[in-house]
Amino acid sequence: MKIISYNVNGIRAALRKGFIDWLKSANPDVICLQEIKAQVDQLDLSVFEKAGYCYNYWFSAQKKGYSGVAILSKTEPNKVVFGTGIESMDFEGRNIRADFEGVSIMSLYLPSGTNLARLKHKLEYMDLFQNYIDKLKKEIPNLVICGDYNICHEAIDIHDPVRNKNISGFLPEERSWMSNFLNNGFVDAFREFNSEPHNYSWWSYRANSRQNNKGWRLDYTLITKPLQEKLKRAVILSEAMHSLSLIHISEPTRRIT
C-alpha cells in the first residue's frame, strides 16, 4: 500500500497548479491532505473521481478558507471517522480517519502556535489528541497517522536549532510531547530509513530559505509498532513548499471492525 501525505496549502489553489496531473503521476493508493482551506460544496469532486479516487472524504473547518483535512482513496474504506468527537478539537477540521482491511489511516493537521493564544490552544489540542490516540490504539493497533504536526522533533529536524529554540514548532514542551507520543507505541517512518540531517519538509518564503535548504521537518508519518515490520519505504518528496511524505507498507490482512 502506497500512502502519501501532503499539506496542499489550499486545495483549490493546488488544483489550479496541476494537482490532478501530479496525483495521477504519483499514483498513491491513499493520499492524506492537510490545510485544504475549502468546504466540500466549493469543490468539483468529479475531478478526483476521474483521477481514480472515487472515495474522497473531506473534513472542513467551520471557518471558511481555513485549515481542514481530507483522505482520497482508490478503494472504499470500511469506515470513515470525521474528527475525534471532541468539539474543542473538531471545529477547525484537523483530523479524519479511514479504516481499511488491517490498517487505519489518519490525516492530521496539528495547530500552529503563532501567538500566545494559539500556542495555548495547540498545547491543549496535543494533550487531548494524545488521550484520544491512547484509547484508539487499544481498538485499532495498526494505525498510520500522516500529517503536518507543526513540530520539529529533534535538532536534526531543523536548520538552526539554536536560534529557533524559543520559536513555536521547536519549543521544549512541543518536542517533549512528540517524544512522549513516539515512546507510547509509535515509530517515525522516515527515520527508520534515514538518519541524516538536512531533510526538511517546509521552508519559509523569506531569504531564499528553500534554495539554501534552511528548512523545518514539520510533516511526519507515524506508524504503530505492529506495522513496523511491514514498512518497506519512507521518503520525503521535495516537490513543493510543503514537501510530501510517502510510505510503502506491505498489504495488511487483518480486518478492522
Residue ranges and their predicted role:
Residues 40-42, 65-66, 114-116, 152-162, ...:
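Short catalytic/ligand-binding loop motif for oxyanion handling, primarily in non-cytosolic enzymes
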Residues 64-80, 197, 209-229:
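Conserved beta strand-loop-helix elements of the APE1-like EEP
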Residues 247-257:
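Single conserved hydrophobic/aromatic residue that forms the stacking wall/gate
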Residues 27-30, 47, 51-55, 127-214, ...:
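Metal-dependent phosphoesterases centered on the DNase I-like endonuclease/exonuclease/phosphatase
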Residues 85-86, 110-126, 162-166:
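Surface-exposed cleft-lining segments at the edges of enzyme active sites
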Residues 1-9, 102-112, 146:
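Active-site-proximal beta-strand elements of phosphoester/diester hydrolases
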Residues 1-51, 55, 61-69, 153, ...:
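N-terminal, active-site-proximal structural segment of metallo-dependent hydrolase catalytic domains
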Residues 37-39, 45-113:
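Structured beta-strand-rich core segments of catalytic domains in phosphoester-bond hydrolases
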